[in-house]
């Protein structure tokens, strides 16, 4: 699944266009490198979202098969990465 579609599906961003724009300006990183919107994600990858307020990191637990994941089920697909 494309990273822009994944971000929208699990609810990290509201719209896919916003996810695409974030990737294009370098606000989305995948496994430590800047990700283009078409980059494919897989289980175990680490996504870093660079916001003005700071950086949020998530580990991908599984790839959703639904178009949009219900908010109550988000924890099945992503987990916040703990600070070491």
Curated annotation (Swiss-Prot):
Residues 1-64 form the S4 RNA-binding domain. The keyword Electron transport does not apply. Keywords: Protein biosynthesis, RNA-binding, rRNA-binding, tRNA-binding. GO terms for biological process: translation. InterPro entries: RqcP (IPR025490), S4_RNA-bd (IPR002942), S4_RNA-bd_sf (IPR036986). It comes from the Bacteria. One of its GO terms (molecular function) is rRNA binding. The keyword RNA-binding applies. SMART domains: S4 (SM00363). Associates with stalled 50S ribosomal subunits. Binds to RqcH, 23S rRNA and the P-site tRNA. Does not require RqcH for association with 50S subunits. Belongs to the RqcP family. Key component of the ribosome quality control system (RQC), a ribosome-associated complex that mediates the extraction of incompletely synthesized nascent chains from stalled ribosomes and their subsequent degradation. RqcH recruits Ala-charged tRNA, and with RqcP directs the elongation of stalled nascent chains on 50S ribosomal subunits, leading to non-templated C-terminal alanine extensions (Ala tail). The Ala tail promotes nascent chain degradation. RqcP is associated with the translocation-like movement of the peptidyl-tRNA from the A-site into the P-site. This is RQC P-site tRNA stabilizing factor.
